[in-house]
Curated annotation (Swiss-Prot):
NCBIfam families according to UniProt: ade
Enzyme Commission number, as recorded: 3.5.4.2
Reaction(s) the record says it catalyses: adenine + H2O + H(+) = hypoxanthine + NH4(+)
Protein name, per record: Adenine deaminase
Cofactor(s) the protein requires to work: Mn(2+)
Length: 565
């Protein structure tokens, strides 16, 4: 290390040629907001010189472009990109995301510690700096069947891994507020590190108590007044814009130069189709500026503020001593990325091809005790005053509705006239044969069934449909393929996307996943679906830590009271 330090010192002073120099660029200073012509000198993976001229062994002609620090996605689930960490790397890094802080709790809910082992091994080999927050709540609640349970000892075993930042989103709010021993043990074990929050709609003294546990960031704010209270109480609010949860427009009125140290950006869940059509963090920056945010505030939130919030002191600025994560832009306000430097390396196909790929784990994870039948989907009882989930497009929060539904010989039926479909959650981890049954409004589904083995957070199979036979067909198809998404009508598979890695991720290139998603969306529309992202919207129906009405393999849950209805 001593020799490395002395090389940096010598090259920074100009005593010897730097390893790489970026010439003829305008550096966007995140302290003052100035655009300053300069060379950027790099030694290995570190910046060693700015605001001067340098000679280098290698040189990049900036051609007058604008240099900004690499972007940091402060909270995401790689699994929600539907591809492996290596394809995520190849898909997202060209959009300027040089650091991604992931929570592998999707895979952890299926595989337990094996998910941490896989992600940490992959993180050592990706080009981007993939960091891991350890999944704090596996399972999220006791009101569902998960594939694994992680206790404090499981988490502590990874605490000092160099790729680990701290604890991921602490979703068990009642456990924190009521002093659940398992929750308190986890909070105490990571008290000297970062603890990420998950606090939808929390306010007042309940929020105070939650923050007093040592939690410092939150990505679940969906309204400006909610976010304002949280930043006033010391939280860093991570403004989220994913494939389902779209909170940016509601929150960016709070983001300005004065408040930017207390805001960062995240995507949480964003798939390759959205990335292809819109972008990743580059889209969030571009959209924020379109909505009136000053560029200085937007780029600070995307890098410097994010680095500060998560204790990554070696990045977030283009300055000597910082990690050489640099994005070259053709246009600052439109955030048009032209080149990316990650740890001093120009990002290109050759760099991606040099990686050593870690073999995927969790194959054949969809385990049903027997094929399901149409009879398994039946809902018995009265149709009067039935609890119904109301889907809100662009949100994972649902409405708690009560509607009268049609009946036939003691069975409650879906009602396309009211836009009400049946929804079932089928346990798929081989532990039991549970099936939760209920109803949902808002898909627009007129016929057939849609099913997904992605079902946050325990990832049982969630299926929505108007036909019990098609619903059963869809569930059985997912077991045969090892998991994924499928659209079925009249007993025929119209389209599917295979996700054999833990039933969550494809082992195919991200371009193929993107193309398969296009076909799936088109198939869903022929069945009447009106949602822009029906499969990810479907995948959040079983998440009982998000208000107001949800469904697991145990049944329908009133999230406010955490009781079955």
């Amino acid at each position: 290390m001593q020799k490395t330090i002395m090389r940096r010192v010598a090259q920074g002073q100009g005593h010897e040629p730097v390893d790489l120099v970026i010439k003829n660029v305008r550096l966007f200073d995140l302290v003052t907001g100035d655009l300053i012509p300069t060379d950027i000198a790099i030694c290995g993976d570190r910046i060693v010189g700015t605001y001067g001229e340098y000679e280098g062994v290698q040189a990049i002609d900036g051609a007058g472009r604008i240099a900004v620090p690499g972007f940091i996605d402060t909270h995401l689930h790689v699994e929600s990109s539907l591809v492996t960490p290596f394809e995520f790397d190849r898909c997202v890094l060209p959009h300027g995301v040089t650091t991604a802080i992931c929570d592998p709790h999707e895979m952890a809910n299926v595989l337990g510690r094996a998910a941490f082992d896989y992600f940490l091994a992959a993180a050592e080999r990706t080009i981007m700096d993939l960091r891991v927050n350890l999944s704090s709540c596996v399972p999220a609640t006791s009101m569902e069947t998960s594939g694994a349970v992680l206790n404090v000892d499981d988490l502590v075993a990874y605490r000092h891994h160099p790729k680990v930042i701290g604890l991921a989103e602490f979703m068990n709010i009642p456990g924190v507020l009521n002093g659940d021993p398992g929750c308190v043990d986890k909070l105490a074990a990571f008290a000297d590190g970062h603890i990420d929050g998950h606090a939808p709609l929390m306010c007042g003294k309940a929020l105070n108590g939650y923050l007093a546990a040592g939690i410092s960031t939150d990505h679940e704010a969906t309204a400006a007044d909610e976010a304002l209270e949280k930043v006033r109480k010391g939280m860093t609010v991570l403004i989220r814009e994913g494939s389902v949860c779209k909170d940016l427009e509601a929150l960016v009125p709070l983001l300005n130069v004065a408040t930017s140290p207390f805001f960062a950006f995240c995507t949480d869940d964003r798939n390759p189709l959205e990335i292809a059509h819109e972008g990743h963090l580059d889209f969030l920056i571009r959209r924020a500026i379109e909505l009136g945010v000053e560029p200085l505030a937007a780029y600070r939130a995307a890098s410097l503020s994010a680095a500060t919030a998560f204790g990554l002191r070696d990045r977030g600025q283009i300055a000597p001593g910082k990690r050489a994560d640099i994005v070259l832009l053709d246009d600052l306000e439109r955030c048009q990325v032209s080149d990316v430097i990650s740890a001093g390396r120009l990002v290109n196909d050759a760099l991606f091809n040099s990686r050593e790929i870690v073999s995927p784990v969790g194959l054949e994870s969809v385990k049903l005790p027997r094929p399901v039948t149409a009879q398994d989907m039946a809902v018995e009882g009265s149709g009067r005053d039935r609890p119904v989930m109301g889907v809100i497009p662009g949100q994972i929060i649902t409405e708690f509705l009560r509607l009268d539904l049609p009946e036939d010989h003691g069975h409650v039926l879906p009602d396309p006239e009211q836009d009400v479909a049946k929804v079932c959650v089928v346990a798929r981890h081989g532990h039991n044969d549970n099936i939760g049954r209920g109803f949902v409004r808002g898909f627009g589904l007129k016929e057939g069934a849609l099913a997904s083995s992605v079902g946050h957070d325990s990832h049982n199979i969630c299926v929505v449909g108007t036909s019990d036979a098609d619903m059963a067909c869809a569930v059985n198809h997912l077991e045969k393929t090892g998991g994924g998404f499928v659209a079925v009508r009249n007993g025929q598979v119209l389209a599917d996307l295979c996700l054999p890695v833990a039933g969550l991720m494809s082992d195919a290139p991200y371009e193929q996943v993107r193309d398969d998603l296009i076909i799936l969306r088109k198939a869903a529309k022929t069945m009447g679906v009106v949602l822009e992202e029906p499969f990810l919207q479907l995948a959040f129906l079983p998440l009982p830590v998000i208000p107001h009405l949800k469904i697991t393999d145990f049944g329908m849950i009133d999230v406010r009271t955490m009781s079955f209805v």
